[in-house]
């Protein structure tokens, strides 16, 4: 049975090639075609002999996701992609354009088991984990379609990265490899809802990668309501693991905080958050919620402008470095899960 060559790390591919009589430098050539020239057809890899191309075609194939939909913001060029995988499941990726860099936001699972109440992805349910190749292929597919060079990566798309730990770590190492994309570990961020034991493991396995924790509430009572996994991993456990992560890596931790009108945007919430993060040197991203349909009593509405500023002022007063995230792609379905959810709904 032929295998998708993108699912192999560099080291694994060297081993696979040696089994079929191909030298190590042939891996360099193939990776150069795939990762730098975005060529996914062995027959067009002209610095390989016809015999070698035939050998590769007999044992491997190159599968990158099929583009189903692409939305480009007229405001800031933010680009949202909807991809179809080999098994017809769908995932999303996003390109974010900055004056000095292009950042890719990529998915790690089809759907998400975390089921955060404010997230369109979580409301669609969980299907399966992505392979390392499916994670990495989002990067090269986006580069090919938008003709850009991606320099920063955030694992903040569909899915909980730390619940697909092995494949996520493998994909990071593949993207960092000097023969592949050669993206610095320090330009890669992994966002998690908070899996304490995996946060500590990540510190040991990928100490240079940046960590972002989706906290969203300063206490267990409120977090239980919007982040169901908090019933398993409490705020206190998450903060403790973040401190252990800092101790091991010496990296600053970013905390994501979704602001929801008249739920977690009060002065008292800001005071409790400041107390929780006291002495950590943490960074807080304040994110006004993207409205999503809700079947419960809680309405996911953006806070008033003055409430957002009031929350920020409290953190400033306590010397907690923070910023209000500037929205990108407001004229397209740029929030996580929106494009896929609409596609699934229209198919029914």
From Swiss-Prot:
- Enzyme class, one word? transferase
User: What is annotated as the active site?
Assistant: 92 (proton acceptor), 336 (s-methylcysteine intermediate)
Q: Name one GO cellular component term.
A: cytoplasm
Q: Which domain of life is it from?
A: Bacteria
Indicate where this protein is primarily found: cytoplasm
In terms of PROSITE patterns, this protein maps to: RADICAL_SAM
Q: Reaction catalysed by this chain? A: adenosine(2503) in 23S rRNA + 2 reduced [2Fe-2S]-[ferredoxin] + 2 S-adenosyl-L-methionine = 2-methyladenosine(2503) in 23S rRNA + 5'-deoxyadenosine + L-methionine + 2 oxidized [2Fe-2S]-[ferredoxin] + S-adenosyl-L-homocysteine; adenosine(37) in tRNA + 2 reduced [2Fe-2S]-[ferredoxin] + 2 S-adenosyl-L-methionine = 2-methyladenosine(37) in tRNA + 5'-deoxyadenosine + L-methionine + 2 oxidized [2Fe-2S]-[ferredoxin] + S-adenosyl-L-homocysteine
User: What cofactors are annotated for this protein?
Assistant: [4Fe-4S] cluster
Q: How is the cofactor bound?
A: Binds 1 [4Fe-4S] cluster. The cluster is coordinated with 3 cysteines and an exchangeable S-adenosyl-L-methionine.
All disulfide bonds of the chain are 105-336
Q: Where does [4Fe-4S] cluster bind?
A: 112, 116, 119
EC number per UniProt: 2.1.1.192
Q: Where does S-adenosyl-L-methionine bind?
A: 159-160, 191, 214-216, 290
Q: Which SUPFAM superfamilies match?
A: Radical SAM enzymes
Protein function: Specifically methylates position 2 of adenine 2503 in 23S rRNA and position 2 of adenine 37 in tRNAs.
**HAMAP family in UniProt:** RNA_methyltr_RlmN (MF_01849)
Name of the protein in question = Probable dual-specificity RNA methyltransferase RlmN
Q: Which organism is it from?
A: Fervidobacterium nodosum (strain ATCC 35602 / DSM 5306 / Rt17-B1)
User: Its gene?
Assistant: rlmN
């Amino acid at each position: 049975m032929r295998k998708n060559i993108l699912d192999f790390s560099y080291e694994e591919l060297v081993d696979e090639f040696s089994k079929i009589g191909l030298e190590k430098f042939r891996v360099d050539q193939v990776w150069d075609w795939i990762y730098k020239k975005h060529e996914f057809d062995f027959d067009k890899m002209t610095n390989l002999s016809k015999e070698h191309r035939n050998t590769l075609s007999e044992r491997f194939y190159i599968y990158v996701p099929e583009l189903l939909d692409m939305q480009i913001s007229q405001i800031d060029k933010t680009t949202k992609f909807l991809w179809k995988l080999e098994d017809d499941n769908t995932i999303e990726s996003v390109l974010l354009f900055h004056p000095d860099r292009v950042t890719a936001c990529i998915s790690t699972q089809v759907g998400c088991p975390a089921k955060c109440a404010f997230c369109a992805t979580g409301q669609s349910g969980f299907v399966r984990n992505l392979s390392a190749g499916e994670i990495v292929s989002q990067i090269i597919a986006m580069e090919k379609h938008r003709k850009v060079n991606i320099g920063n990566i955030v694992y903040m798309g569909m899915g909980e990265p730390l619940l697909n730990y092995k494949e996520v770590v493998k994909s990071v190492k593949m993207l960092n490899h000097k023969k592949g994309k050669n993206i610095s570990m320090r330009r890669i961020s992994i966002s998690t809802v908070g899996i304490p034991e995996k946060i500590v493991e990540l510190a040991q396995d990928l100490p240079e990668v940046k960590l972002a924790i989706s906290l969203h509430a300063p206490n267990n009572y409120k977090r239980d309501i919007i982040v169901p996994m908090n019933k398993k991993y409490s705020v206190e456990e998450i903060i403790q693991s973040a401190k252990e992560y800092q101790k091991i890596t010496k990296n600053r931790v970013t905390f994501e905080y979704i602001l929801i009108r008249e739920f977690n945007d009060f002065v008292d919430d800001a005071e409790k958050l400041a107390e929780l993060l006291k002495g950590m040197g943490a960074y807080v991203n304040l994110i006004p919620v993207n409205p999503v349909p809700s079947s419960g009593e809680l309405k996911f509405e953006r806070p008033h402008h003055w409430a957002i500023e009031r929350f920020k002022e409290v953190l400033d007063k306590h010397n907690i470095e923070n910023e209000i995230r500037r929205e990108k792609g407001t004229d397209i379905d740029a929030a996580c899960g929106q494009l896929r959810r609409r596609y699934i709904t229209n198919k029914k």
